[in-house]
Amino acid sequence: MTHPDPYLRGHGDTRYRVHHYDLQLTYAVVTNRLDERARLDVEVVEPTHHLKVDLRGLQLGGATVDGAPARYRRTSGGWSVAVGDRRAGERLVLELKVSGKPRPVPGTHGEAGWEELTDGSMVGSQPQGAPSWFPCNNDAADKATYRIEVLTDAHYQVVANGTRTVCERQ
């Protein structure tokens, strides 16, 4: 079920919450190409057999649930991933392969999200921009922790909120 928040119309799914996102991104600046693997540690809140994942403008190229291949299909504003019959309180790990050329997401107060610049890119995600660059449950009440790993062209710098644990140049 889509969340009723007026700022996030069509975003979010109240049947689950994400406890942690683990994102591995590879970004080619010149072509604005993003390839990523996203791992979502999920808790089911309401009985369901599928979850709606918010992802706008990017392709889903594979999905697993607890390591087993899962069926998925495009829906309005994202993707529906089959998770089998799940009861409230169950935990699962959803892994998704994503690719494409990210772009901002339109919303009630204008566009937000991934923005391609003349020499690089930036992300401004409030309130609806997160699905422009990673698969998520875009519900402002669904708080989670994140680990983000980014591989990009050597002469670019990756900047993000949080604590940097490793910075390698190759």
Each language-model region and where it sits:
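Acidic/His-enriched low-complexity segments
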Residues: M1-Q170
